Amino acid sequence: MAEVNGDFPVPSFADGTGSVSAGLDLLVERSIHEARSTEPDASTQLTIIFGGSCRVFNGVPAQKVQEIIRIAFAGKQTKNVTGINPALNRALSFSTVADLPIARRRSLQRFLEKRRDRSTKPDGSMILPSQLTIIFGGSFSVFDGIPAEKVQEILHIAAAAKATETINLTSINPALKRAISFSNASTVACVSTADVPIARRRSLQRFFEKRRHRFVHTKPYSATTSEADKNETSPIVT
């Protein structure tokens, strides 16, 4: 029975109160807790990026991640980019040109900038080291110059320590991106003309017919000719 409070009726429940029963509250709270417990914990997810590929391991303990980071730190070979090419050091060690005339100083500055740009271009003697990125628990670590053998060892350790199936992502390879974009372009080019308006579709069909007609007749040593062309080229007998 509903009780009237002023002008608005207040519903009464089985327990005699004007609110939802405690049993229903516990049921809703338990359902929400179960739904949250089924979601993957992002804090135990380990992501390793190396050589254009990305691999995700779920359920890796923090102690195992610390071991992986120690292995990566011991195997890194960080180099100073400035010290790789001696020509770059010579270009940076030039004395100041503030005491030269303005026109000559600007010309010399442009010359030094061009020389520095040429020196910093990558060549056979300036190879950038491989980079390993480890993401875990909302933080990431980047290591330069990690050998591929050391990365394979790290991947084996992470795979052995994972609690669930590994996710292999190959979405950051430039060659794969180009292949996907080319595939998408080909798919768009092969879309049917059924969704084109009627007038435009007919015009497009005539265009393709004329194009095929020109291709057949301009192709050298073509043995296929249409009946209409034979009738047009045959002499008229009166």
From Swiss-Prot:
Q: Where in the cell is it found?
A: Nucleus
Taxonomy of the source species: Eukaryota, Viridiplantae, Streptophyta, Embryophyta, Tracheophyta
Q: Where is this motif: Nuclear localization signal 1?
A: 103-110
Can you say what this protein is called?
Protein TIFY 3A
This protein's GO CC annotations: nucleus
According to its UniProt record, where is this protein mainly located? nucleus
- Disordered, as annotated region: 219-238
Q: Which UniProt keywords apply?
A: Jasmonic acid signaling pathway, Nucleus, Plant defense, Repeat, Transcription, Transcription regulation, Ubl conjugation
| PTM section of the record | Ubiquitinated. Targeted for degradation by the SCF(COI1) E3 ubiquitin ligase-proteasome pathway during jasmonate signaling.
The induction comment states:
Up-regulated by wounding and herbivory.
Per UniProt, the short sequence motif Jas 1 occupies residue numbers 101-120
Which PANTHER family does the protein's record reference?
PROTEIN TIFY 3A-RELATED, PROTEIN TIFY 4A-RELATED-RELATED
Q: What's a BP term from Gene Ontology annotated to this protein?
A: defense response
The organism encoding this protein is: Arabidopsis thaliana
User: Which cysteines are cross-linked by disulfides?
Assistant: none
Q: Which domain of life is it from?
A: Eukaryota
- Name the gene behind this protein: TIFY3A
- Per the annotation, the residue ranges of the short sequence motif Jas 2 are 197-222
